[in-house]
């Protein structure tokens, strides 16, 4: 908990224990979907597992705007994109000139440098307790 809400700054993108925001996947109940090794690898090598709905996408619009974020919902007529600011924008699919889906995670890959082994172990263990 200390790492999540402290120097790990995980709460800035993830929701857990009723706190944080949802720029990244909700971590509550992750133990029912994955084991602790998945959690550790996701912290240290975030590009290895990109959860569906959290892939970074860049949209070039016909009106010249560029939007970057995560596609939250999509139909043949519209796209709902979640911007890094937390804003959700709904646009007409016909207004998209070009779309680029990133092959990497939006999660920083710097945790191998900013967290020590104990921090990662404590963080992963705490995440696995979340209901």
Feature-to-residue mapping (PLM):
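Sequence/structural segment immediately N-terminal to covalent heme-attachment motifs in c-type
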Residues: 1-16
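Flexible gly/pro/ser-rich segments immediately N-terminal to CXXCH heme-c attachment motifs
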Residues: 5, 27-34, 111-115
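Residues within well-ordered alpha-helical secondary structure of globular protein domains
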Residues: 5-6, 45, 126-129
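Generic structural signal for secondary-structure transition and capping sites
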Residues: 9, 48-51
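A general structural signal marking secondary-structure boundaries and capping sites
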Residues: 17, 47, 130-131
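Gly/Gly-Pro-rich "capping" loops immediately C-terminal to redox-active cysteine motifs
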Residues: 19-44, 50, 56-101, 106
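Long, low-complexity intrinsically disordered regions
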Residues: 110-131
């Amino acid at each position: 908990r200390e790492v999540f809400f402290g120097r790990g700054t995980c709460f800035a993108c993830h929701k857990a224990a009723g706190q944080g925001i949802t720029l990244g996947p909700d971590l509550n109940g992750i133990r029912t979907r994955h084991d602790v090794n998945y959690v550790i690898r996701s912290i240290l090598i975030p590009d290895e597992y990109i959860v569906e709905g959290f892939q970074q996408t860049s949209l070039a619009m016909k009106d010249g705007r560029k939007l970057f974020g995560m596609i939250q919902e999509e139909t043949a007529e519209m796209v709902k994109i979640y911007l890094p600011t937390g804003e959700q924008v709904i646009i007409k699919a016909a207004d998209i000139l070009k779309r680029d889906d990133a092959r990497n995670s939006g999660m920083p890959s710097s945790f191998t440098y900013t967290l020590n082994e104990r921090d990662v172990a404590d963080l992963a263990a705490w995440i696995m307790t979340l209901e």
